[in-house]
């Protein structure tokens, strides 16, 4: 359920963009009527309408995700708060300035913030971030936690670079597709590799899984 909620804003962004892209003139008229007060000049063009509408949806979806967790009395992860702040500020800039550049940079900034968190946690808090998150559920040797922590830092740093590369070398439509499915697919593959590595070094009753 949590994983679904995490990816829901991205999926809704993609769906909104694609629907609006297929009906650009109608989307522009709708955006001008309903978002005119939020954009510089008050008029939304057909070329920019899809990404502006998708941006509004992703802001609202992320806010709804936070409110849902709060109403259920569940903890809102720090990174979700960061994501909400980034999408609100950068998404707001995209809407006001009619510029897709800001929302395209948002995933990269978030990825780099997460990469920095994994790198700085051992220095600031004296423990690997992943170990702090999963240490109570999984027992691994210290060296394994360290490697996993560095792997996550490298993965997020690389994803940030990849997102910008796609954003500046391909169309907005291609970028939106990559954002929804490319990033998600790479995340699943990486998590699978992490799971296999964890299983290899996992301790069961004090014995490593690969030695049992």
From Swiss-Prot:
Cysteine pairs bridged by disulfides in the record: none
Classification via InterPro entries: YciB (IPR006008)
Domain of life: Bacteria
Keywords for the protein's UniProt record, in alphabetical order: Cell inner membrane, Cell membrane, Membrane, Transmembrane, Transmembrane helix
Location in the cell: Cell inner membrane
Membrane protein topology class: Multi-pass membrane protein
GO cellular component, one term: plasma membrane
TM helices/strands, residue ranges: 49-69, 78-98, 105-125, 150-170, 178-198
Record-linked HAMAP family: YciB
PANTHER family linked: INNER MEMBRANE-SPANNING PROTEIN YCIB, INTRACELLULAR SEPTATION PROTEIN A-RELATED
Protein task: Plays a role in cell envelope biogenesis, maintenance of cell envelope integrity and membrane homeostasis.
Family, similarity comment: Belongs to the YciB family.
Protein name: Inner membrane-spanning protein YciB
Organism: Leptothrix cholodnii (strain ATCC 51168 / LMG 8142 / SP-6) (Leptothrix discophora (strain SP-6))
């Amino acid at each position: 359920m949590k994983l679904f909620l995490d990816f829901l804003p991205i999926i809704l962004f993609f769906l909104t963009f694609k629907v609006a892209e297929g009906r650009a003139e109608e989307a522009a008229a709708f955006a001008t009527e309903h978002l005119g007060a939020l954009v510089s000049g008050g008029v939304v063009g057909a070329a920019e309408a899809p990404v502006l509408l998708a941006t509004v949806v992703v802001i609202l979806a992320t806010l709804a995700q936070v409110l849902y967790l709060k109403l259920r009395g569940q903890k809102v992860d720090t990174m979700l708060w960061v994501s909400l702040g980034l999408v609100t500020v950068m998404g707001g800039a995209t809407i006001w300035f009619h510029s897709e550049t800001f929302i395209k940079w948002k995933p990269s900034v978030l990825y780099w913030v997460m990469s920095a968190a994994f790198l700085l946690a051992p220095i600031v808090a004296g423990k690997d971030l992943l170990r702090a998150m999963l240490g109570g559920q999984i027992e691994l040797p210290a060296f394994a936690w360290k490697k996993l922590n560095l792997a996550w830092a490298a993965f997020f740093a690389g994803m940030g670079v990849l997102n910008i590369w796609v954003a500046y070398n391909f169309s907005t439509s291609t970028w939106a597709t990559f954002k929804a499915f490319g990033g998600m697919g790479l995340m699943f593959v990486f998590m699978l590799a992490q799971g296999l590595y964890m299983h290899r070094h996992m301790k069961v009753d004090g014995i490593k899984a690969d030695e049992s």
